[in-house]
Each structure stands twice: as C-alpha cells, then as structure tokens.
C-alpha cells in the first residue's frame, strides 16, 4: 500500500497483520487484494512482493475459493463477500490453493469489514488450514 493517502483503517490494519503469526490479508471495498502478511506468504508459497495487488477476480482465480473437486466457486456469499456486503464479520470454510505446488487445502476463514461512517474501507481476513484429523471428527 504505497499510495500517498491510504485510509487510516487500512494503514492500521496493515500494521496489525504484519505482526500476526496467523495468516491474514487486507482488501479494498471491492474485495481487491491490497496486502498479505508473512504467515500468509508462507502458506501461499509466494511473498506479497511477488504477487502484488490484485483485483478480486484475479486473486480468487489464483488462490481460490474452490469446491471439493477443485472448481472455482463464486465469492459473493463467502466470508469476504458477506463482510463487504453486510458490514458484519463473517466466517466460513472452503478450499484454497496453498503453496507453490498448487495443493488445495481446506481453510477456515474469518472476514471483518473495515468501516468508517458512511463507507467501507475494505476488509481484514484471517485464515488457517483445517487440520485433516479435525475435519474427520464431529
């Protein structure tokens, strides 16, 4: 986020997630990728500097979400879409492409809208792989 005039919540969000051990990313109000932290880079197999900012459709195509068969799924009713549309936190589970080898893994995702009075600045999203042993239990 090198633009001269970044909204304060996005600057604060970037400062917060930079130090998190939990994989996290920031988006703009349209869901475009603005930044992800080192923990996310480790899971994705690429640094933010290698990936850069991406429109929502492009980063969804590269990283997911995908269904159980690996087909892309619409993002509108997943946590990020819900958080941006409804202005409230949202959580869900789906598959994403992790690591440079293209492996699809199930992740748990929480999305928090970044709101100012009368407008959205974007969203903060945290995610983590679902442990395979845990996914088989009830």
Task: List each model region and its residues.
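Terminal output helix/cap of sensory domains in signal transduction proteins
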Residues: 12, 51-96
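Beta-strand residues that line the small-molecule/cofactor-binding core
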Residues: 75, 104-106, 122
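Short, acidic, Ser/Thr-enriched surface-loop or helix-capping motifs
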Residues: 28, 67-68, 99, 115-116
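PAS/PAC sensory module
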Residues: 91-95, 106-109, 124
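Sensory helix hotspots in PAS and closely related PAS-like folds
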Residues: 41-42
